[in-house]
């Protein structure tokens, strides 16, 4: 597969601007990671109009519901490094089979065509795309966030992200921090071994 997966937020962009961004970064497939793929305020990004507009540009569309956000944290959540409850809920969700299945679907799409994850939020650090990016980077996949036509950034890991025995963790007492110390993608021997032997994160 292409060793890079992109991310983008449709925000309030006119559809033409959004399509131009995809073209600028040579995106060939969009993986929609919105849990609910519709928008009353931005109807051009509802699922069917978006699918049609992308198809006209030769861009594939894939809704991966299993990667959608808006997950509630468990009462016994160990991921207290995330003070934001929405992100803590998603960190809990990452440990489950449904997320693993969704991630495998994303990797399958990205294995065929240059792919960008898409959600509504303009900036990645306010979106669950950030946590998906953490997972991908630990697995040795480069993630790049599209900001505008001239600015795209390699994922820098979220501040709560840690590496413990080659695995991603958001438990504050486990392992060592990734943010500011490791680059995406993580290329440790432990990370590659975990990726080869275990489909969970």
Label each region the model flagged.
Residues 1-201:
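Residues lining hydrophobic/aromatic ligand-binding pockets adjacent to catalytic sites
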